[in-house]
């Protein structure tokens, strides 16, 4: 358990990290996509030096890696802990003004001096947070708990291990850029992160342990038409916009993000751009089951084939499908101790594990493709990617306790 000074330092770290504008930029081709991520990476490098870690490195893409050898047994497992530097693209991360609310008494939470507020009427989980210390933003930005809380929790765990000389296995840490736009792991130096397994500290409520995620792909459908003066268009114009609308109607209406939950997969029309002469449709394909995932890709191909056979077209509709990431569970289940140890650590800390499937992806999914099992552990935060984002100090304390317990249990 953290003492008062360690808890204060945990909060101080987190609040300081939120002052860095690390919002990633959609459409970026290089990483890091924002200068603030490199600034935060350099700050973390200095903290790691002060904590006495070894092999500290910042890559040219702002990936920070470091190593803490075991103080018990050099042959103990090597466990990695990962968090990402960037914040989400959907909401500004500039000039974050965090506010600490001690002993939350329930009811609405006003954010700054504007009209934004967080209400238990919309967020039922607030009823469970009465009496806790909350951290929120001022209603103009997100808070950045996703994932600066994870960074603060990892750094604080390292500090506690050093201060108290607690027994621990070999530890590697990594802080990565551009997780929110899917670029960070493209430049991850796997050779500098040799682990038996790892954890991303990027989950939500206390107790969350996630080791399943969607299989994911992106499909791009291109439809070309023929423009013509509308007064003489009969039997000549081919309106790509009209064809695109009809194409979209070929998908099952009940298999969209807004109609699905749990382990149900979906098709998501994420972009619709163009004009009469040319339209591009971009779809996200998601499914937990590998066979179901492949069937979804076949479905889109069959829909394209049917249109090409039945419709009057300028040229055949084209389809490009690119896999994004796979369900990490295929790898995690080959390293069952990665889940078992986290479960045991949580229970020792008085937390009942909540096994959830991620309706999305994590850096751990990419690492799983490289053969490294990497479940996702809670941070204690809520409402990520939103002006209503918040986190509890108690939840952050719990995450630190779980990390230090995992590395202690691994020594035995």
UniProtKB/Swiss-Prot annotation:
Q: Which GO terms describe its molecular function?
A: metallopeptidase activity; tripeptide aminopeptidase activity; zinc ion binding
GO cellular component terms, semicolon-separated: cytosol
Give GO BP annotations, semicolon-separated: peptide catabolic process; proteolysis
Cofactor: binding details: Binds 2 Zn(2+) ions per subunit.
Keyword annotations for this protein, in alphabetical order, are:
Aminopeptidase, Cytoplasm, Hydrolase, Metal-binding, Metalloprotease, Protease, Zinc
Q: Which chemical reaction does it catalyze? A: Release of the N-terminal residue from a tripeptide
Top enzyme class: hydrolase
* SUPFAM superfamilies in the record: Bacterial exopeptidase dimerisation domain, Zn-dependent exopeptidases
Amino-acid positions noted as binding Zn(2+) 2 in the UniProt annotation, renumbered to this chain = 146, 180, 385
Cross-referenced InterPro entries: ArgE/DapE_CS, Bact_exopeptidase_dim_dom, Peptidase_M20, Peptidase_M20_dimer, Peptidase_M20B
Give the subcellular location.
Cytoplasm
The EC designation for this entry is 3.4.11.4
Enumerate the cofactors the protein uses.
Zn(2+)
Query: In the UniProt entry, which residues are flagged as the active site?
Result: 86, 179 (proton acceptor)
Location, primary (coarse class): cytoplasm
- Kindly provide the name given to this protein in its UniProt entry: Peptidase T
């Amino acid at each position: 358990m953290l003492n008062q000074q360690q808890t204060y330092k945990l909060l101080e770290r987190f609040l300081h990290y939120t002052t860095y504008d690390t919002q990633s930029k959609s459409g970026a081709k290089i990483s890091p996509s924002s200068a603030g991520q490199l600034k935060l990476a350099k700050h973390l490098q200095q903290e790691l030096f002060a904590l006495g870690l070894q092999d500290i490195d910042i890559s040219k893409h702002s990936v920070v890696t470091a190593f803490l050898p075991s103080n018990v047994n050099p042959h103990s497992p090597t466990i990695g802990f990962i968090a990402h530097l960037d914040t989400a693209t959907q909401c500004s991360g500039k000039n974050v003004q965090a506010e600490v609310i001690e002993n939350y008494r329930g009811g609405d939470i006003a954010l700054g001096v504007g009209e934004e507020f967080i209400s238990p009427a919309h967020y039922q989980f607030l009823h469970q947070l009465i009496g806790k210390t909350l951290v929120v933003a001022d209603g103009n930005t997100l808070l950045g708990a996703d994932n600066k809380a994870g960074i603060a929790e990892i750094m604080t765990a390292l500090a506690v291990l050093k201060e108290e000389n607690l027994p621990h296995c070999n530890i590697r840490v990594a802080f990565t850029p551009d997780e929110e736009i899917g670029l960070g792991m493209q430049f991850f130096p796997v050779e500098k992160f040799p682990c038996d397994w790892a954890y991303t500290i990027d989950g939500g409520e206390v107790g969350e342990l996630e080791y399943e995620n969607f299989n994911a792909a992106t499909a791009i459908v291109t439809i070309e038409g023929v423009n013509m003066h509308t007064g003489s268009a009969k039997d000549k114009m081919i309106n790509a916009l009209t064809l695109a609308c009809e194409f979209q109607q070929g998908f099952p209406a009940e298999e969209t993000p807004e109609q699905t939950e749990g382990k149900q997969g979906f098709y998501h029309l994420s972009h619709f751009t163009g004009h009469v002469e040319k339209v591009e449709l971009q779809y996200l394909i998601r499914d937990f089951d590998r066979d179901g995932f492949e069937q979804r890709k076949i479905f889109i191909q069959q829909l394209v084939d049917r249109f090409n056979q039945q419709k009057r077209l300028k040229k055949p509709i084209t389809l490009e499908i690119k896999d994004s990431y796979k369900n990490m569970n295929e790898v995690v289940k080959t390293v069952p101790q990665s889940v078992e140890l986290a479960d045991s650590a949580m229970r020792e800390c008085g937390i009942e594990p909540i096994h959830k499937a991620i309706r999305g992806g994590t850096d751990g999914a990419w690492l799983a493709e490289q053969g490294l099992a990497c479940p996702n552990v809670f941070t204690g935060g809520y409402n990520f990617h939103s002006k209503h984002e918040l986190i509890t100090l108690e939840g952050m304390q719990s995450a630190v306790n779980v990390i230090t317990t995992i590395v202690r249990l691994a020594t035995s």
